[in-house]
């Protein structure tokens, strides 16, 4: 409905008719195929990444010369075929290890603490040393500071509401580094160069946890969120989208926005001290190369209006609540999400973002088997 409202505003302002066709949940690809078979084809559609693009690359206009592309803050947020820009992300999200900086700062003041500042956690070895020490001193920390910590990490639940955090988002790290080494964006089969790294961060999650490993199969996403929100854990792998849940007063959580930040997921790779957060998209705009030149230009004009006009930016940033990769979303159109602010700070500090390569994973079965084998 928000896209339809925005399209109506554009039509009222410019006189150009914009029709928005929505698909029922889980039927976007099917709906797109149906619409593409009609005499009047959509001029704008979206794909979720390289796998989605593979089905539609012959329908994607090269956007490299567009004004829309010129407003991108990074080429990390495009889908390319050679030098041709076939898709541009319009929503970006970030994930990493959410942490309670208040508890960590208190820990740093303790005798024999592994670190004296949170900033010292910039690789897997240090993260593990800190988590191990916290796990071994839970009673001491609780007694000294009045917390009710149950573990260093929240439960890494393998219930369907939670397992995507590990078989998709955590699995992205070893895939990213293998792709980075080879200078590729996709492959028919990974070699598993960094699977041992995947295993060691997973082992840390389930060892220094709020629950025993045998309980993980039934632990849910809501339970992990609650554990972090109620200050029962210091570390919690999740993303920027969790901010609204953790700060929603109706949930009754003890943690506040001022308590929270986000650090990278370190897996023990050489040079990871320069790593930032995992930032990417599953929402890319594509302009139909089969449409008329007139319709293509009208579509590009609409998209440029969306990211530059006050009405468009207000809708995207505040009504839809999206974070975008465009340089036009500054000032009042910037997010007040502390996790996004942390991501921006890593970028400002020159840290490299870990791109989302999990969209190249071929199936849910592959994901399930990958966790079984580690």
Language-model segments: which ranges?
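Paired acidic/hydrophobic, glycine-rich loop segments that form the ligand-binding mouth/hinge
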Residues: 43-46, 234-238
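C-terminal capping/gating helix-and-loop segments adjacent to ligand/active sites or protein-protein/ligand interfaces
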Residues: 279, 322-328, 340-373
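Conserved N-terminal structural module of periplasmic/extracytoplasmic solute-binding proteins
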Residues: 1-52, 65-68, 110-111, 269, ...
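Extracytoplasmic/periplasmic substrate-recognition and gating elements
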Residues: 13, 251-320
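Extracytoplasmic/periplasmic solute-binding protein
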Residues: 82-90, 95, 125-186
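Short helix-initiation/N-cap motifs at beta->coil->alpha
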Residues: 22-31, 122-126, 216-230
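Hinge/lid segment of periplasmic solute-binding proteins
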Residues: 48-105, 145-148, 165, 259-266, ...
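Glycine-centered hinge/linker elements that transmit conformational signals in sensory
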Residues: 131-132, 181-218
């Amino acid at each position: 409905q928000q896209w339809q409202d925005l399209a109506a505003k554009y039509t009222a302002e410019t006189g150009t008719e914009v029709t928005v066709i929505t698909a029922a949940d889980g039927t976007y690809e099917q709906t797109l195929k149906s619409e593409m078979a009609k005499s009047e084809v959509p001029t704008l559609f979206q794909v979720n990444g390289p796998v989605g693009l593979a089905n539609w690359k012959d329908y994607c206009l090269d956007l490299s010369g567009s004004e829309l592309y010129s407003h991108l803050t990074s080429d990390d947020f495009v889908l390319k075929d050679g030098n041709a820009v076939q898709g541009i992300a319009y929503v970006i999200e970030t994930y990493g290890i959410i942490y309670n900086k208040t508890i960590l700062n208190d820990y740093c003041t303790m005798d024999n603490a592994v670190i004296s500042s949170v900033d010292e956690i910039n690789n897997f070895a240090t993260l593990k040393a800190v988590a191990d020490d916290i796990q071994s001193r839970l009673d001491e920390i609780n007694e000294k500071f009045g917390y009710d910590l149950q573990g260093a990490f929240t439960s890494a639940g393998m219930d369907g509401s939670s397992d995507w955090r590990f078989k998709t988002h955590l699995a992205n790290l070893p895939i990213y580094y293998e792709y980075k080494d080879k200078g590729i964006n996709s492959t028919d089969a990974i070699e598993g160069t960094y699977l041992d790294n995947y295993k060691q961060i997973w082992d840390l999650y389930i060892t220094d946890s709020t629950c025993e490993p045998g309980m993980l199969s039934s632990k849910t996403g809501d339970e992990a969120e609650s554990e972090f929100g109620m200050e029962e854990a210091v570390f919690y792998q999740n993303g920027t989208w969790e901010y609204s849940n953790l700060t929603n007063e109706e949930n009754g959580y003890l943690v506040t926005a001022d308590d929270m930040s986000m650090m990278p997921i370190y897996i023990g790779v050489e040079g990871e001290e320069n790593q930032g957060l995992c930032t990417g998209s599953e929402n890319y705009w594509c302009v139909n190369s089969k449409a008329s030149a007139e319709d293509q230009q009208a579509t590009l004009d609409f998209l440029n209006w969306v990211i530059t006009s006050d009405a468009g930016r207000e809708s995207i940033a505040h009504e839809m609540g999206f974070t975008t990769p465009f340089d036009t979303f500054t000032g009042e159109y910037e997010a007040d999400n502390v996790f996004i602010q942390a991501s921006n700070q890593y970028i400002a500090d020159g840290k490299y973002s870990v791109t989302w390569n999990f969209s190249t994973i071929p199936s849910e079965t592959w994901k399930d088997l990958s966790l079984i084998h580690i």
